[in-house]
């Protein structure tokens, strides 16, 4: 008997996945941040990324089984977003993971049970693939699950064999596909046919280790890594033609369509692509900003900026002028806030960042349009804009090729697409390595270096300055013999006092010096025991085998270790005040601030935050000595030392003990006495994902700086309003009330003016047979007042048509059409269609109901022409 899968919302799909695996003893873990701890990738691009050190055997997990819904960002196929049914930049990956616990048989059994019993997918609609040599998986699917062999497809290594890199953990995988058209039969199943099949669940069986010769040896601990795309499962269960029309994304698309006065269902394919891009990208930017990413010209900040700019560009392509992203972002926030409450809590920050970027890019686009005008002028006689010029506009000014083509077409010019695509391919080749895959191996050069040099000896717990030998010099990740002054370098030493970033603590800063040599070290990272010092050669040159003096910045180190010990005190205070079951989910320990993420199902109250702050400052004032000891891990656990999930611990561990207050396993640097911290101040508490909270704080001298800024703001407010500090809150409430009243009064005045002006225009209406026609330029009247005037005029005129236009103060065109019911029925005229066509004269578009519609344009100089055309056409049509 054929079953029918029930409709489930995106939230229901996510919850049922997590609860299913929780019932099978999997620990539900919150989504990691989109900012990964892994320095080899810019963004979290897969559900397994947070577990990478566990899969590589570098860390021991606290749980043998885990399940997550992980936020992910991928931009390697950004040009396909909106053009295919399933490409996205932002997506959620549902996953279940086994760390040396269950393996292939159980993973397959649960995947089938989840798919057919929980989601109730018809078994006859599921096709699976296995690695061509994985007879065990084939047999399990056929004999244990009962899938007919013709619906089990053997695939090659390219499709169904996962590997970490040239060497390391690897294994076959098995994928579950949904068949939208099982009636086509099982004779010629082609899983590449994405109009019929969609892959929705991937099971990776990590069971081998590949050596340098390519030989495979069984792993001692076999792991399971799976991924189910939430958006793909939503498409299947909600029975929509693509991921974009699911309840996870489509409300965002609808918001953008409404702003542009577009009916999505009736829109052209080109317009739908732009709306889908907006829907996808807005999800990305909202979550990126919520996770602390800000727009910039480098690294993940550039990814954010690029996505925001693409939203603006596609908005212009569908006729949206001016700022609009904040409105669309509000819908994205509404859709995500239940699963990821931090998007609502950081709403003002998200919208502020979007507004700043949108404003700046609109100015950039104006400059791009000017440059395009110059290019058109110089190429008019040639009949074609070069691909190089088009790519410069695209790459430097963010000017989309489609927009360049449209504007060029108006001047009877084409664009050299082949040349443009050649430039694009060159750029993609330069950048694809940073985005394509997760690299679970040591970065290229370091991988080779590790074969020739020993791990760096870290002596920085006791030595803040020492002499060391230069083992390697790298520029842009490539080894060189010598680096000259001005070079940005990465230096590997045989021993170092510099702490390498780990455990949330940033790397030390300082200098490497020698005879006529100065290298300013700005950061230190470590990979597989090798410490890499990132810096700039400020004087002289540095070569392999040179002797240098390595000196850390003591002031920075003091502040970092004060913040690190303060972080331990913060966790202890949270356990004491809020809930003893609270555990660390992440942290940042910098020289100027600290951040602590922790598992907690609710917000910490303001009263609790004050109690936590007071308790920490009490511990600081009590001047507790910090005791640091190395001991067997079992001894540390017996003493009650706190360990963090996901961290790798050896048989011997380093324990940081503030007697009677806190005891944690930690490899970071710390104060000798809590009194060295000085002061502690909580700046904020917020949610960053479902069940995970974040506290940001400052300690030591940074507290005084923080309070100084606050004091300056308070003093400025008191001086400006001639009030006392304790009166500020009441004054703000009063001002808000007055502003709200004033805004209402202003709106009423605008409406009164619109009514008055519309009454004056009644005498200008012309009679055309049994109908009245009024077409008028309303000056700078805003869009809302324009609509009020049009509706009132049409009601007073009776049977007929009213067309009004204006150029509001922000400099864009607004148009309104109001038609009587008789005009709709007898003359077959629709206000929406009519005003949409007229708006094209002003370089815009719009639409609406048959009796009332609005439109806009971006060429105010053509308003008179548009109104004249409207009058001529209606005069003819109403006869």
Curated annotation (Swiss-Prot):
UniProt-listed InterPro entries: aa-tRNA-synth_II/BPL/LPL, Ala-tRNA-lgiase_IIc, Ala-tRNA-ligase_IIc_anticod-bd, Ala-tRNA-synth_IIc_core, Ala-tRNA-synth_IIc_N, Ala-tRNA_ligase, Ala_tRNA_ligase_euk/bac, DHHA1_dom
Needed co-factor(s): Zn(2+)
Residues reported to bind Zn(2+): 564, 568, 666, 670
Localisation: Cytoplasm
SUPFAM superfamilies linked: Class II aaRS and biotin synthetases, Putative anticodon-binding domain of alanyl-tRNA synthetase (AlaRS), ThrRS/AlaRS common domain, Translation proteins
Catalytic reaction list: tRNA(Ala) + L-alanine + ATP = L-alanyl-tRNA(Ala) + AMP + diphosphate
Entry's EC annotation: 6.1.1.7
CC terms in the record's Gene Ontology section: cytosol
EC class name: ligase
Domain notes: Consists of three domains; the N-terminal catalytic domain, the editing domain and the C-terminal C-Ala domain. The editing domain removes incorrectly charged amino acids, while the C-Ala domain, along with tRNA(Ala), serves as a bridge to cooperatively bring together the editing and aminoacylation centers thus stimulating deacylation of misacylated tRNAs.
Family the entry assigns: Belongs to the class-II aminoacyl-tRNA synthetase family.
Protein name (record): Alanine--tRNA ligase
Organism for this UniProt entry: Crocosphaera subtropica (strain ATCC 51142 / BH68) (Cyanothece sp. (strain ATCC 51142))
Native organism taxonomy: Bacteria, Bacillati, Cyanobacteriota, Cyanophyceae, Oscillatoriophycideae
Gene name as annotated: alaS
